[in-house]
Every structure is written in structure tokens, then in C-alpha cells.
UniProtKB/Swiss-Prot annotation:
This is Nif-specific regulatory protein. It holds the Pfam family GAF. GO terms for biological process: nitrogen fixation; phosphorelay signal transduction system. NCBIfam families: nifA. ATP binds at residues 240-247, 303-312. Residues 35-176 form the GAF domain. PROSITE patterns: SIGMA54_INTERACT_1, SIGMA54_INTERACT_2, SIGMA54_INTERACT_3, SIGMA54_INTERACT_4.
Length: 524
């Protein structure tokens, strides 16, 4: 085991001579290979003992099941992870899934900085470098991934470590082809072997941490919490204002958990009146009420073995809260109109934009249920508190909108600056709506300042709220955006170019706002 106090010494020793010694020992191990799993485990031991590569992992891809499985994992005695070989990755999922999908090496100076890092093994030091390289099979198709922690903390040493691991990966891949791949693949090069190049996109990609954008301290902390809580069945309470992405958090937790292959069922507790809520969630028997012509399973039964996301839990009634508490405590329920007790195995992720502590104090929310739900709270900050993420979010959303519209879109630096001056009371949802509206207005494919329109007229960006002429006293700061524009037009004699100068805008921006805000221009 390599202690952190020895890390500086070990880094200095990792030179060409040490690499050669490690490579020689690995070649001996591979030349004597008789059993794949045992051989790969011995290779990882050499990487750990002689090449100072911690927590080495070798994953192999099964194209029939479309999964990447851990074949060998180097662990220390005090970090043994039971069932590690049962952990699976889909192509494009996490760091190793990305390497498999792209067929290219991945080097991270600090592993936790990458949003695709899932940490399902709970072995890795978040502050250490991470290197993952593909194992290339016949016809340049990846058949697996070799990954490890590099003890070389200095970034300038990482390229040498990467080249060393790529060489080791080539040796491993050759051995795997001889031991695992069927001989028919070698005899028929035109046929696809059992292990094929994976598809670049899979349905799970929309739910991974790579879909969570932001490098602010608050978002880094949230991503770390998601990695940790995903491994367990702990009940999670996601809190935050409307539009902050609470459902996205729930999706990420489920799809990176051991329950990922099971159902993820969503339900909005405020969407139905109380008399229909219980039937929708718990199901009903035939004849339970007028219109119940057949038995129907509820959301809890549909989510059995998986995850149930209860949005707006703070809006639920007292009777529903009592039944939910029973399920959380005992895992039991009955359908409406039935007397058969059903057992369900469901993980609950709840979300609310309410201050539940105050609701408990007022008697609107059960205190015992509050403590049952609040086992692992995740508080999402509003967008105005992480303005450093707005630029990255905007570029991400523009790419998403461009894909949905089937065209090329770009956003200018000026538009980004304007977005960063707005306080976004509707949070990320409002930002996405704003950019989608701007994309529709952008005929050239460039989203610039002149096509950016905001929803909240009482919360204009600084570019419109503050301008030189306002000091003359003619522009009342209490006016909303439409009223400001009309005031400027009246001041300018309804000449759009003059009004634009008064507001610090371009004539095109003024023209767009006149059209969108339905301002009638007098005939001069």
C-alpha cells in the first residue's frame, strides 16, 4: 500500500527504468496466462506494486448485452468492495463508458472535476489524477477499458504515464483476443467479433452527471453528494426553487444507482385532487368507485424494485401523508377498494419548493414524515446564486436546442454577458425558454443580444435598466420593460434609432421588442 507521505518519493522513482521493469513483469505474466480473470488481476498487481498505479481496473465489453463489466479490480485490504464484479456500465456512461464509446484515452488531472465521474466503486481519491485507455480489438474496435489512479500529481508527468498505460493496454488486448474471443473471429475478419465497437449514444446518457452543467462550488458539492447517495437506497429530499432542476437530480440518482435497470416513475403530487391522488399512486380494485371498470396498478406498484420520484411533496394532503409514511416505515400498502396488503420495494426521492420546516410548524405537514423524507437532503441553489455557471449552461442549452431544431446555432459573447446580468427568477427553466425563444427569432443561427427577450418585465437586465439618459430624470426606474421602451420611443419622437441610443441598445433590438411586445407605432 502506498501512503500519501511517500507519494513524492514514488513520483520521482517513476522513470523510464521503472516503466521498463513493470512492462517486463507484465509481459511475463501475460506470456504464462491460462485463466483470464487471474491473469488480469496479476497485471493490476504489477501496476500497483511496480508502476505506482493505484486502484487499477480492467473492464470488458459484451456487445450482446451491451454492457461493460469489471473483470479485474485492484483493491487494498482495507478497501475491499464486495460485489465489485457485478457493477456494470453502459457505453457512454461514466468515464470508462465514455472511453469505450469514443475509443480514445482520457486523462484527468483531478478525477472529481469531471462531471461524468460516477464513483460507483467508492475507491478513488477525488484529488488524484485518473487515466483510462481503451483495449483495442480486431478492426480497431474497443473491447474494453484499462483505468487507474496515477500517483504522478504533477500534470507534466501524466502524458508519460498515459503512454505507459496505452502500451500495457495493447499487451492486455492481445492476450484477451487470444484467450476470450472466439477463433472464428480471427478466421473471418469480415464478420463482427463478439465484442464490438459500442454505439456512441445510449438512452441512459440523458440522465448521467454529464447532463448536469456547472463548475461552481455549489454544483461541485451537489455532484459529489449524488455520487455518494446513488449507491444506497437512502430516501432523498431535493429542495429548491421552481426551475432549478430537481427532477434532473432525481434522474441522475436513479440512473447511477443499483436500481438503474428498474423503473423510474415520476409523479407530481399537486397535479390531481385528493380524491384521485390515492387511486393514481396506490392503484384501485375493480368496482372501487364509479368508473373503476378494472383493476389498476398504482405508481408505487409500477415502481416496485425501482425509484418513485414524488415532486411537490409539500402540496400533499394529510391522508396521503399518512399512507406514504406507512409505506416508508413498513413497505406495505393496499389498493383503493381492496383489502389485500401488498409489499413494495421502492426507493423514494421527494422534491419540494416549500419551506417544510415552516409547514411542519403550521401543522400542514406531518413532522414524522418530514424526518422520514429528510434523511439525505439536497439543496439546489437558484441560478442567481451561481452566475458563474450561466455561460456554460447557455452553451449547453443552445446545443440541445440546435439538436432538437435540426440546425446549427451559436450564441455570441454579447448575448452571454446580457444573460449574466439578469437575475433569472425562473431559474434554469426560464433560461432554457429564453434561449429557445431567441433561437426561433434568430434567422441567421446566431443568438445575439438583439433577440434576447426576458419573461419578467419587472426584472429587466442591467443593459436596459441603466443607461446614460436615465440620469436626466426622464426614465422612471419603476417602469417595466415594455413601459421603458414606450417611454424611450416617446422621448425619441418614435424614431427607433434614437430610442435605441437612449436605452443603450441596437436598433434591431428595439425593433424586435416592438414586435414581440405588441407596441403600436404611430404613423409619422
Amino acid at each position: 500500500m502506498i501512503h500519501k507521505s511517500d507519494s513524492d518519493t514514488t513520483v520521482r522513482r517513476f522513470d523510464l527504468s521503472q516503466q521498463f521493469t513493470a512492462m517486463q513483469r507484465i509481459s511475463v505474466v501475460l506470456s504464462r496466462a491460462t485463466e483470464a480473470s487471474k491473469t488480469l488481476q496479476e497485471v493490476l498487481s504489477v501496476l500497483h506494486n511496480d508502476a505506482f498505479m493505484q486502484h487499477g481496473m480492467i473492464c470488458l465489453y459484451d456487445s450482446q448485452q451491451e454492457i461493460l463489466s469489471i473483470e479485474a479490480l485492484q483493491q487494498t485490504e482495507d478497501q475491499t468492495l464486495p460485489g465489485s464484479t457485478q457493477i456494470r456500465y453502459r457505453p457512454g456512461e461514466g468515464l470508462v463508458g465514455t472511453v469505450l464509446a469514443q475509443g480514445q484515452s482520457l486523462v484527468l488531472p483531478r478525477v472529481a472535476d469531471d462531471q461524468r465521474f460516477l464513483d460507483r466503486l467508492s475507491l478513488y481519491d477525488y484529488d488524484l489524477p485518473f487515466i483510462a485507455v481503451p483495449l483495442m480489438g480486431p478492426h480497431s474496435r474497443p473491447i474494453g477499458v484499462l483505468a487507474a489512479h496515477a500517483m504522478a500529481r504533477q500534470e507534466e508527468r501524466l502524458p508519460a504515464c498515459t503512454r505507459f498505460l496505452e502500451t500495457v493496454a495493447n499487451l492486455i488486448a492481445q492476450t484477451i483476443r487470444l484467450m476470450i474471443l472466439p477463433t472464428s473471429a480471427a478466421q473471418a475478419p469480415q464478420q463482427s467479433p463478439r465484442i464490438e465497437r459500442p454505439r456512441a449514444c445510449t438512452p441512459s446518457r440523458g440522465f448521467g452527471l454529464e447532463n448536469m452543467v456547472g463548475k461552481s462550488p455549489a454544483m461541485r458539492q451537489i455532484m459529489d453528494i449524488i455520487r455518494q447517495v446513488s449507491r444506497w437506497d437512502t430516501t432523498v429530499l431535493v429542495r429548491g426553487e421552481s426551475g432549478t432542476g430537481k427532477e434532473l437530480i432525481a434522474n441522475a440518482i436513479h440512473h447511477n444507482s443499483p436500481r438503474a435497470a428498474a423503473a423510474f416513475v415520476k409523479f407530481n403530487c399537486a397535479a390531481l385532487p385528493d380524491n384521485l391522488l390515492e387511486s393514481e399512486l396506490f392503484g384501485h380494485e375493480k368496482g372501487a368507485f364509479t368508473g373503476a371498470v378494472r383493476q389498476r396498478k398504482g405508481r408505487f406498484e409500477l415502481a416496485d424494485g425501482g425509484t418513485l420520484f414524488l415532486d411537490e411533496i409539500g402540496e400533499s394532503s394529510a391522508s396521503f401523508q399518512a399512507k406514504l409514511l406507512r409505506i416508508l416505515q413498513e413497505g406495505e400498502m393496499e389498493r383503493v377498494g381492496g383489502d389485500e396488503t401488498l409489499r413494495v420495494n421502492v426507493r423514494i426521492i421527494a422534491a419540494t419548493n416549500r419551506h417544510l420546516e415552516e409547514e411542519v410548524r403550521l401543522g400542514h405537514f406531518r413532522e414524522d414524515l418530514y424526518y422520514r423524507l429528510n434523511v439525505m437532503p439536497i439543496a439546489l441553489p437558484p441560478l442567481r446564486e451561481r452566475q458563474e455557471d450561466i455561460a456554460e449552461l447557455a452553451h449547453f442549452l443552445v446545443r440541445k436546442i440546435a439538436h432538437s431544431q435540426g440546425r446549427t446555432l451559436r450564441i455570441s459573447d454579447g448575448a452571454i454577458r446580457l444573460l449574466m446580468e439578469y437575475s433569472w427568477p425562473g431559474n434554469v427553466r426560464e433560461l432554457e425558454n429564453c434561449l429557445e425563444r431567441s433561437a426561433v427569432l434568430s434567422e441567421s443561427g446566431l443568438i445575439d443580444r438583439d433577440v434576447i427577450l426576458f419573461n419578467h418585465r419587472d426584472n429587466p437586465p442591467k443593459a436596459l435598466a441603466s443607461s446614460g439618459p436615465a440620469e436626466d430624470g426622464w426614465l422612471d426606474n419603476s417602469l417595466d420593460e415594455r413601459q421603458r421602451l414606450i417611454a424611450a420611443l416617446e422621448k425619441a419622437g418614435w424614431v427607433q434609432a434614437k430610442a435605441a441610443r437612449l436605452l443603450g441598445m441596437t436598433p434591431r433590438q428595439v425593433a424586435y421588442r416592438i414586435q414581440i411586445m405588441d407596441i403600436t407605432m404611430p404613423r409619422l
